[in-house]
Amino acid sequence: KVHGSLARAGKVRGQTPKVAKQEKKKKKTGRAKRRMQYNRRFVNVVPTFGKKKGPNANS
């Protein structure tokens, strides 16, 4: 029923080195955020052939 014993719970998270949070610029909210989304998705799109690349593609 369970994949692996509960003794292994949180193994990977425990192993990863702690990285301190960075200070970042505040995100836009409401209308301004939607405007940014719209621009990102529909306005400055690069015409490509074949399969569409996802928003998180790294190539």
Swiss-Prot record:
Residues 23-35 have a biased composition (Basic residues). InterPro entries: Ribosomal_eS30. Keywords: Ribonucleoprotein, Ribosomal protein. Pfam families: Ribosomal_S30. The keyword Cell cycle does not apply. The modification N6-succinyllysine is found at residue 51. It comes from the Eukaryota. Belongs to the eukaryotic ribosomal protein eS30 family. This is Small ribosomal subunit protein eS30. It comes from Rattus norvegicus (Rat).
